[in-house]
Swiss-Prot record:
This is M-phase phosphoprotein 9. Negatively regulates cilia formation by recruiting the CP110-CEP97 complex (a negative regulator of ciliogenesis) at the distal end of the mother centriole in ciliary cells. At the beginning of cilia formation, MPHOSPH9 undergoes TTBK2-mediated phosphorylation and degradation via the ubiquitin-proteasome system and removes itself and the CP110-CEP97 complex from the distal end of the mother centriole, which subsequently promotes cilia formation. Residues 483-495, 949-967 have a biased composition (Low complexity). It comes from Homo sapiens. Residues 609-804, 1109-1174 form a coiled coil. The modification Phosphoserine is found at residues 781, 788, 994.
Length: 1183
């Protein structure tokens, strides 16, 4: 859309418009109807003037409110989000509206500026029409002008092949342009109007020629010859007014030179101009129309910036010259011309008659010269030159043209013509191609080193060199050299265009040409024309572009031979003269004479070559001018009519363009409003669509997440259902198991109660039995006491009888003393041996039956109580061992057996309820006693083991509480405690014996009888222990710690004996126990008869009773261990083989059973050895 581009290029356009409205140098009318930039309004009123700009976005709040309501009605939106969006949208809309308003304001300003320009251009067109009529009348009256009407009007169509230059001055800074417009307006009489209407570009070139008030002004100058042609003066007032309303295409000298290269040669009479005496008027040609718009001037300026570099110093002096010209435009015009080489001044028509002079670029005055004026000899002396220079110092009107355009070299023109004839490419003879490198020009002009004021003052301190330089500088080779010479050269047609200040090498010093005709050069007819000191640098002198008028092609050819010759030709005069000649050397007459001689020779050669050429050229030009004079007025009229028609066309085109612009503006306004509305709607719709898309994406993601969550929850629900079913089944199983366990527990409680009742009943029975047993013990002790007394009395009586019989026999029968003693000894032995067939009391032999029984019992006892060590015992000790065994066996009375059985039943009942762990931890280390003391007193070992078993059974918390023993011993314990009776000397059986019985007793009989000494231990017992007589020292009770410390060593001994001497199985042992009980019953029949009558301490009965009770416990323990061993072996046999697959629990159970079996085997070995030691089990010796 067009307005978008307008917004982007706003700053550029505004800047260009600002430069356009301030620049009055162009009459170009830019009616640009391009749709992209509608800037013009012809009515002078902007389409927006008087109106307030509506809001850029109409209905912004309404649209936003409706959008917000729609989004909020859709729901599922956050209020904070909408507030933030609303705030940001409002800010965005305000920003866009502000920018659009600023753009519109800038457009309005631009429109106003364009309108002003158009109005001014229209006024200028009207003035052009009025001035064209006066020009036509002026041209009709002037008979000296031979100018073609077409070229005088300067109007050329676009199709014209004439490449005439429009000398443009690029835009400088606006203040500088305004100063130049006010003080140094160009003397260009050709007004170029470039109108760009959008449909085509038209250029109107008009030459402003005014007829002077007095026709005599043309020849009023004192030095102007009759043949000199002067240009009509231009009224300063009209030109100044025109400048105010018209824009001139003004070019810098650089651009002038460039454009002249491209232009076609113009007929000489086509460019006559008016030059006033004191004011320089630069001829500006109307050339090829510029088809570019107004904005192309900036581009032109950029292209020509490097070419203006060498005239900056002149530009700095231009302001000073302009100010001086403002104050004194008449009196100080020379100063302004000297200080500002680029200044252009408009001359008033009434000032001096020399205003009419040929342009420095047309070369028109050359062809008006007579043939005699083509060459002048050099002055004979320097003094004459100085005098001629001083005499030519006339009014400043003659010197104001010193800075005007200078003429090209005739040599250059000749060479150019030759090149064209040979169809060679044009040779660039100027130094403009290298403007930064100044031409090396040899000159003798001392005024080059003078300041402008010294040059202007007319006082020439170095008159002679100046005069000499006036002669030198106009030779064909040196005509382009920067000299201050007078134009009255021998080649007066060169117009003495002094270029001293315009050369790039010498920009500070404008040429100051004095109208001083040299005496020797009489024909100085065109000295006024030569004072057209161009404000352009010397390289930009407007040449007589191909002066030859032989053909039309020659007219149209371009001749840009600038005043500054190319660098290769500039030092042409220095062939015989040094390039650098100091000012002091110029005073030397020898050097000066040499210089003059060289220059004369050079001039002679040059003039001789050019004379024929110029004569032919002059003739052809004269013929051409005569042909053009006839049709000049008619051409002017035709051209004027064409111009009027063209102005009408332009006016109609202007109105059409204005209406077109207005319609386009209206259309653009409507489109802009529509675009803004559409932009709002589009932005709103796009934002809404984006928001909806975001919401759709969010809903999609949320739906995906919800689906995933649903799937995950379903899977979890299934897992929970399965877990719930499993838990339900487990709960049912647990309830059933709990019911079953509750039932079992109820049964167990009932059984426990029944067992508790039975236990109480058994306990009561046991208490009654214990009481009865105590009573029996008391009776037995009384009876034993009585028996012991009776035996003591009997023995005493026997002893007394023996003593009396011995005394009697010694007195009466002495010879048979030996036989009597032998018989008494034998009878005594038989009488004392228990089990003998003699009675203890009477000494008579007993019955046969009783004796057989006693013998059988004796043999059985001797066989049953013999240990493997008895085989090694000496035969001498057999009698005493037999006696001890008989006494041990006969001491077990029926009452003692009954008491033993009761104690065994009670002990085994408590022991049987112990756990296996307590059995292994308590029984195992307490089965045997220490090595020495256990072998001596097995009764004590049994009593201690019984106590430990009772204490261990009481520690079991899972069993019903047993009878705990109090710290004070009960009556039964007191009765069961072995009592050692300390007999008095009179009551002691041994000590009570009379001295006569002492020799009957053996050594063993004198010691107390011990039933706890085994026969197999007699060899190992020390002698001191056998010889002890105190029975209290023999009953030693070791503490529990000592017995436990020595258990392991004794156990090892017992196991060794068990494995070596008892390989028979356990059931045999059980049978032996039953056999033994039967044997003991049979044995009890003759117990009284087998009881020894010898002295037996009372304590031995109690020790024996404890020993028998401990053996019964051991036998019962042996039976239970054997039964448990059988059960474990049966369980192990039912387990799978180790090669098969078994579970971990099965393996653990198997290992536990094997460990238990090993422990039972060890216990069985220990118990078996203990029983064998006391001859309860059969040994290998008894088989």
């Amino acid at each position: 859309m067009e307005e978008f581009d307008l917004v982007k290029t706003l700053h550029k356009t505004s800047s260009s418009v600002g430069s356009d409205e301030n620049s009055l140098h162009s009459l170009g009318l830019n009616l640009n109807t391009d749709r992209s930039s509608p800037h013009l309004s012809t009515n002078g009123v902007s389409s927006f003037s008087g109106k307030t700009r509506p809001s850029v976005i109409q209905g912004t709040v309404e649209v936003l409110t409706s959008l917000m309501q729609e989004l909020q009605n859709s729901g599922k939106t956050d209020s904070e989000l909408w507030k933030n969006c609303e705030t940001r949208w409002l800010q965005l809309f305000n920003l866009v509206e502000k920018q659009c308003q600023e753009q519109i304001v800038a457009q309005q300003e631009q429109f106003h500026n364009q309108i002003q320009h158009i109005q001014e251009e229209i006024k200028n067109l009207v003035k052009l029409q009025t001035s064209s009529a006066s020009l036509a009348s002026c041209e009709g009256n002037s008979s000296n002008k031979q100018v073609s009407s077409e070229s005088q009007m300067g109007f050329f169509s676009l199709s014209s092949e004439r490449n005439e230059s429009v000398i443009h001055y690029p835009e400088s800074t606006e203040p500088e342009i305004q100063q130049e417009m006010s003080t140094s307006q160009p003397d260009c009489n050709v007004d170029s109007c470039s109108v760009s209407s959008g449909y085509g570009t038209f250029c109107i070139s008009e030459l402003n020629l005014y007829k002077s008030k007095d026709p005599k002004e043309f020849m009023e100058h004192i030095d102007v010859p009759k043949g000199q042609y002067v240009a009509p003066a231009v009224p300063a007032e009209s030109l100044v007014d025109g400048v105010k309303n018209e824009n001139f295409y003004i070019q810098t000298p650089e651009e002038c030179h460039v454009s002249l290269k491209e232009d076609v040669s113009i007929s000489p009479g086509e460019f006559e101009h008016n030059f006033l005496g004191e004011n320089k008027v630069s001829e500006v040609y109307s050339g090829k129309t510029n088809s570019n718009a107004i904005t192309s001037w900036a581009q032109k300026l950029k292209q020509n910036q490097p070419k203006r570099a060498h005239v900056e110093d002149g530009g700095s002096r231009s302001k000073q010259g302009n100010e001086q010209s403002k104050k004194t435009p008449i009196e100080k015009s020379d100063f302004a011309a000297a200080t500002h080489p680029r200044a252009f001044y408009l001359s008033k028509p009434d000032e001096t008659p020399n205003a009419w002079m040929s342009d420095s670029g047309t070369g028109l005055t050359y062809w008006k010269l007579e043939e005699k004026d083509m060459h002048h000899s050099l002055p004979e002396t320097l003094e004459k030159t100085f005098i001629s220079l001083s005499s030519t110092d006339v009014s400043p009107n003659q010197s104001n043209t010193s800075n005007e355009m200078k003429l090209p070299s005739l040599k250059d023109i000749y060479y150019k013509k030759q090149r064209e004839n040979k169809q060679l490419p044009e040779r660039n003879l100027t130094s403009a191609s290298n403007p930064n490198h100044p031409p090396e020009v040899l000159t003798l002009d001392p005024t080059l080193h003078m300041k402008p004021k010294q040059q202007i003052s007319g006082i020439q301190p170095h008159g002679l060199p100046n005069a000499l330089d006036d002669r030198i500088s106009f030779s064909p080779d040196s005509v382009l050299e920067p000299s201050m010479s007078s134009p009255s050269d021998i080649d007066s047609f060169s117009q003495a265009s002094n270029v001293t200040s315009q050369l790039p090498g010498f920009p500070k010093y404008p040429s100051h040409t004095k109208a001083s005709p040299v005496d020797s050069w009489k024909n100085q007819t065109f000295q006024n024309e030569s004072r057209t000191s161009s404000t352009f640098p010397s390289v930009y002198t407007i040449t007589s572009n191909d002066i030859s008028v032989n053909t039309v092609d020659e007219e149209n050819t371009v001749m840009v031979a600038s005043a500054s010759v190319s660098q290769s030709q500039l030092p042409g005069t220095a062939n015989s003269v040094p390039e650098c000649i100091s000012l002091t050397s110029l005073e030397d007459p020898v050097i000066l004479s040499k210089i003059r001689q060289n220059l004369k020779e050079k001039h002679a050669r040059h003039i001789a070559d050019l004379r024929a050429y110029y004569e032919s050229e002059i003739n052809s030009l004269k013929q051409k001018l005569e042909a053009k004079e006839i049709s000049g007025v008619e051409d002017w009229k035709i051209t004027n009519q064409i111009l009027v028609d063209r102005c009408g066309q332009l006016d109609s085109a202007l109105h059409e363009a204005t209406s077109r612009v207005r319609t386009l503006e209206n259309k653009n306004n409507l489109l802009e409003i529509e675009v803004n509305d559409l932009r709002e709607r589009f932005s709103a719709a796009s934002s809404a669509s984006k928001i909806l898309q975001e919401r759709i994406e969010e809903m999609r993601t949320s739906s995906k997440e919800k689906d995933n969550t649903i799937i995950r929850l379903k899977s979890r629900l299934q897992d929970l259902e399965e877990a719930f079913e499993n838990a339900y089944k487990l709960s049912d199983d647990k309830e059933a198991q709990l019911k079953q366990e509750n039932k079992m527990f109820q049964d167990l409680l009932g059984e426990y109660e029944s067992l508790g009742k039975e236990h109480r009943r058994v306990k009561d029975a046991l208490n009654t039995t214990e009481n009865k047993l105590l009573d029996a013990y008391t009776q037995i002790s009384d009876l034993k006491r009585m028996i012991s007394k009776l035996e003591a009395q009997v023995k005493q009586v026997e002893h007394e009888n023996m003593l009396s019989l011995r005394h009697n026999s010694r007195i009466h029968v002495r010879p048979s003393r030996a036989n009597t003693l032998a018989t008494s000894d034998v009878s005594r032995r038989k009488w004392l041996i228990p089990g003998a067939e003699y009675s203890i009391f009477t000494g008579q032999p007993l019955d046969t039956q009783d004796s057989n029984v006693d013998n059988q019992l004796e043999e059985t006892c001797s066989l049953g109580h013999r240990s493997p060590l008895e085989k090694d015992s000496s035969p001498g000790s057999s009698s005493t061992s037999l006696l001890i065994k008989k006494q041990r066996e006969t001491s077990d009375t029926p009452i003692m057996r009954a008491l033993k059985e009761l104690d065994e039943g009670k002990i085994f009942k408590n022991w049987g309820t112990q756990t296996e762990k307590e059995d292994t931890s308590n029984i195992n280390p307490r089965q045997t006693e220490t090595s020495v003391n256990a072998s001596r007193s097995p009764e004590k070992c049994a009593q201690q083991r019984q106590k430990r078993l009772n204490s261990a059974s009481q520690r079991s918390s899972s069993l019903p509480p047993s009878n705990r023993k109090s710290s004070t011993p009960t009556k039964r314990e007191i009765m069961l405690t072995p009592v050692t009776v300390a007999y008095s000397p009179k009551r002691s059986p041994k000590e009570n014996l009379s001295p006569g019985f002492s020799h009957l007793l053996s050594k063993n009989e004198s010691s107390p009888i011990r039933f706890d000494i085994l026969l197999d231990d007699l060899d190992t017992v020390p002698v001191s222990t056998l010889q002890r007589t105190n029975p209290r020292k023999q009953l030693q009770f070791l503490p529990l710690d000592d017995s436990e410390e020595k258990t392991y060593s004794e156990k090892a001994t017992d196991n060794h004996v068990n494995h070596s001497s008892c390989p028979e199985p356990v059931p045999n042992g059980v049978k032996k126990v039953s056999v033994r009980t039967a044997w003991e019953k049979n044995k009890s029949v003759s117990y009284e008869q087998c009881k020894p009558v010898s002295v037996t301490p009372q304590g031995n009965d109690f020790e024996y009773t404890a020993k028998i009770r401990t053996l019964a416990e051991t036998e019962r323990f042996f039976d239970e261990l054997t039964k448990e061993k059988d059960q474990i072996e049966a369980a192990l046999s039912r387990m799978p083989s180790p090669g098969g697959r078994i579970t971990l629990q099965t393996r653990l159970n198997q290992e536990a059973l094997e460990d238990r079996l090993e422990r039972i085997n060890r216990e069985l070995g220990s118990v078996r050895m203990t029983l064998k030691k006391f001859h309860v089990l059969r040994t290998s010796a008894n088989l």
